[in-house]
Amino acid sequence: SYNNPDDELWKVTNELLLSDAVVIFGSIRWGKMNAVYAKLMERLTWIENRHTALGEKNIVENIDIGIISVGHNWNGEEAIKLEKKVMEFFGFKTPNDLFWSYQWTKKAEDESLSGYKKDGKDFDDEFDFIRIVKESIIKFSQFFK
């Protein structure tokens, strides 16, 4: 921003406006998207202000956006539904296939250490996550050789 020379929002904005589609990944903390996501959305309110408050063209109307979240025990689906509405309000296209949440249990009280340990194992079993990450790292490093 003009008043904060260390602000790097322009980097996010440039990539966003050059994209046909954007998928944001985040975690669910205490029933909501995490603080990093919240800060990003707060900083991007200027997008919505352009067409709502200032009557200018919606500069994101042709961009598909989605949000994928991972959480342990509470409110993941509801949080994603809310954030989809936020993206619609911003003026993005919001195809249902780009909004998804993984939640290990629906028991809000499950804060046990054993539950968190089992959560990670179950996630890996369901999505083969560790193997995919290892393969991706190898492919990425080979790309730069």
Regions found by a protein language model. Name each.
Residues 88-145:
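Glycine-rich phosphate/pyrophosphate-binding loop and the adjoining helix
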